Amino acid sequence: MSKTIVRKNESLEDALRRFKRSVSKTGTLAEARKREFYEKPSVKRKKKSEAARKRKF
């Protein structure tokens, strides 16, 4: 979980920018999107092999 404390004399936009940066660095949002719905193991394997095939070419 990411925490951002608003500093003294800091605008809300700057604090929000720091929060968004910390969330993207930790991968919290991407992980939540990935786990939003259950994915069968066979589908996971299929996606993994397709991604490897794309990386190869």
Curated annotation (Swiss-Prot):
Keywords: Ribonucleoprotein, Ribosomal protein. GO terms for biological process: translation. The keyword Ribonucleoprotein applies. This is Small ribosomal subunit protein bS21. InterPro entries: Ribosomal_bS21, Ribosomal_bS21_CS, Ribosomal_bS21_sf. One of its GO terms (cellular component) is ribosome. It comes from the Bacteria. PANTHER family: MITOCHONDRIAL 28S RIBOSOMAL PROTEIN S21, SMALL RIBOSOMAL SUBUNIT PROTEIN BS21. One of its GO terms (molecular function) is structural constituent of ribosome. Belongs to the bacterial ribosomal protein bS21 family.
